[in-house]
Amino acid sequence: MVLMILPIIGSVSVSEGLVAIVTLCLVYMLMKYKHTEIPEGLKRLPGPKPLPIIGNVLEVYNNPHLSLTAMSERYGSVFQIQIGMRPVVVLSGNETVRQALIKQGEDFAGRPDLYSFKFINDGKSLAFSTDKAGVWRARRKLAMSALRSFATLEGTTPEYSCALEEHVCKEGEYLVKQLTSVMDVSGSFDPFRHIVVSVANVICGMCFGRRYSHDDQELLGLVNMSDEFGQVVGSGNPADFIPILRYLPNRTMKRFMDINDRFNNFVQKIVSEHYESYDKDNIRDITDSLIDHCEDRKLDENANIQVSDEKIVGIVNDLFGAGFDTISTALSWAVVYLVAYPEIQERLHQELKEKVGMIRTPRLSDKINLPLLEAFILEIFRHSSFLPFTIPHCTIKDTSLNGYFIPKDTCVFINQWQVNHDPELWKEPSSFNPDRFLSADGTELNKLEGEKVLVFGMDKRRCIGEAIGRNEVYLFLAILLQRLRFQEKPGHPLDMTPEYGLTMKHKRCQLKASMRPWGQEE
């Protein structure tokens, strides 16, 4: 998301432009002659030579995940590029990434002080915040406690093991009806369009305790806001890397700030309503759970760092935004892969038919008996690598990695796409093959292989909603596979070339779906 620098859109006078150019040149000259002392015994970071002002932007502008993967083959798993005026260290390779994020996790646990981060959730975002370690840990602990509490929240009826299972199963069943209805009317459907609304509904249910009809304007407004956010963030903000540009007119940045303001206001309204109706003995959703844990901390005299009520809004905002885009993108890719590999689709259906049957809806408890489905999900994560990079990291002190010196406050990119396609780690990485994650006889999931897949980050900055996200993808997909057969629409061949952005999505397409014999054994 931050690897692109686009032209500044807006009316800039000639005098303003000249002042900006002169200033940029002076800053560049100062930076050029600034010398970083390398401690004895350590090496200077390798990397391509940057151009004045713009750095290496032209070399990484198009498909940065591929450009930086090619650079890693030349410079190694630790190298440096320059985006605008900001040095950026790029990490590739499974061992190097694990060394940095797990064994040296404290050193790389920061977030860079990027200009655009200040406007996400009013600067209170848990994922993007540059808060000091103690404050960030307190907020992360609060969020994780709230998620654990929600994970054990009971459903409204005994047939569901938990609230999450109830939300996803009901919405998954409704999605099946929606797709069959659209097929009756139009003869084909856009998978992303319908999946994104269903996922948004589940997230609304989990975070806010609300479920909407699929044509509800408030729900569709949230979907549109998320799409706008992804487009704007995916195109990048030049001011993150050329500081002087933040003082010039920038329509893209104005739009970015407007989207954040609108969504913050929406979440603030719902959180305020939750405070008014909050009942400690009746926790309804994640927002209630956050309020509950926040109230407990206020009563704890031993709590060194208190989390303000307003930061609850930021945490809810993060959970909604991250879960919404990630899950909808993963599920949409899954349906496209099912169409591209019909023989795998039939194997998955047969597994569900044998282990679950065609009478009842799949449950979370069935997951352990569906190794092929779990392997399929892992291979979607690996092969599509729809999250090609983690949110940028930052070093919180001078450190070293693989013998190279990395100064404090250095921006760090983690190339997840490279790790997921590294020929030293995977056999035939360009091939889509779920069996790579199964035991030799195909009856068990190889968890050690599965742990190599990078999608949710690692260790201290690992996505806190990972467990919920994985379960959501599994349940949705199990229900769809059990009841529907997906096919390519004649005359509309699939194009699986990913489109780079905040999350990499497949090109929009039209597919067909037909009902399998539901409610009876085939």
Swiss-Prot record:
Gene Ontology molecular function: heme binding; iron ion binding; steroid 17-alpha-monooxygenase activity
Pfam family for this entry, one: p450
Known catalytic reactions: an organic molecule + reduced [NADPH--hemoprotein reductase] + O2 = an alcohol + oxidized [NADPH--hemoprotein reductase] + H2O + H(+)
Enzyme Commission number: 1.14.14.1
Cofactor(s), by name: heme
Keywords attached to this entry: Endoplasmic reticulum, Heme, Iron, Membrane, Metal-binding, Microsome, Monooxygenase, Oxidoreductase
Membrane topology designation: Peripheral membrane protein
Binding, heme: C463
Record-linked PROSITE patterns: CYTOCHROME_P450
Gene3D superfamilies reported in the protein's UniProt record: Cytochrome P450
Induction: By 3-methylcholanthrene (3MC).
Location, primary (coarse class): endoplasmic reticulum
SUPFAM superfamilies to which the protein is assigned, alphabetical: Cytochrome P450 (SSF48264)
Record's function text: Cytochromes P450 are a group of heme-thiolate monooxygenases. They oxidize a variety of structurally unrelated compounds, including steroids, fatty acids, and xenobiotics.
Annotated family: Belongs to the cytochrome P450 family.
PANTHER family found in the cross-reference section: CYTOCHROME P450 1A, STEROID 17-ALPHA-HYDROXYLASE/17,20 LYASE
Protein name: Cytochrome P450 1A1
Protein's organism: Oncorhynchus mykiss
